[in-house]
Amino acid sequence: MERVTLRIPEQQIDEVEQMVERGKFPNRSEAIRSAVREMIDEHTDKTGAKSWAKV
């Protein structure tokens, strides 16, 4: 797995931390990976083509 560095507003990090504390995710990294997977799924049409990127 590749490491990616990004900047996220403090308020969003606080919200992610709250989800981790409530047990929805085991850690922040998994919460963010889940959000990325959800975004990819949301933007992939039924043929598998990504609507947001040229493939």
From Swiss-Prot:
Q: Describe the disruption phenotype.
A: Deletion of the gene does not affect the growth rate but causes drastic increase in cell size together with morphology defects. Division is strongly impaired. However, a small subset of mutants are still able to divide. The deletion mutant is insensitive to the cell cycle inhibitor aphidicolin.
Chain ranges passing through the membrane: none
Q: Pfam families of this UniProt entry? A: RHH_1
Organism domain of life: Archaea
Presence of keyword Hydrolase: no
Q: Which residues form a coiled coil?
A: none
Family annotation (CDD domains)? RHH_NikR_HicB-like
Induction comment from the UniProt entry of this chain: Part of the cdrS-ftsZ2 operon. Transcriptionally regulated by CdrL.
The positions making up the signal sequence are none
Instruction: Output the Gene Ontology cellular-component terms.
Output: cytoplasm
Gene3D superfamilies membership:
Met repressor-like
Where's it mainly located?
Answer: cytoplasm
Which keywords does the record carry? Activator, Cell cycle, Cell division, Cytoplasm, DNA-binding, Transcription, Transcription regulation
The record ties this protein, via PANTHER family, to: BLL4998 PROTEIN
Function (record text)? Transcriptional regulator which plays a central role in the regulation of cell division. Activates the expression of the gene encoding the cell division protein FtsZ2, and of other genes encoding proteins predicted to function in critical aspects of cell division. Required for normal cell division but not for cell elongation. May act during the transition from stasis to growth. The CdrSL-FtsZ2 transcriptional network might coordinate cell division timing with cell growth.
Q: What is this protein called?
A: Transcriptional regulator CdrS
Q: Which organism is it from?
A: Halobacterium salinarum (strain ATCC 700922 / JCM 11081 / NRC-1)
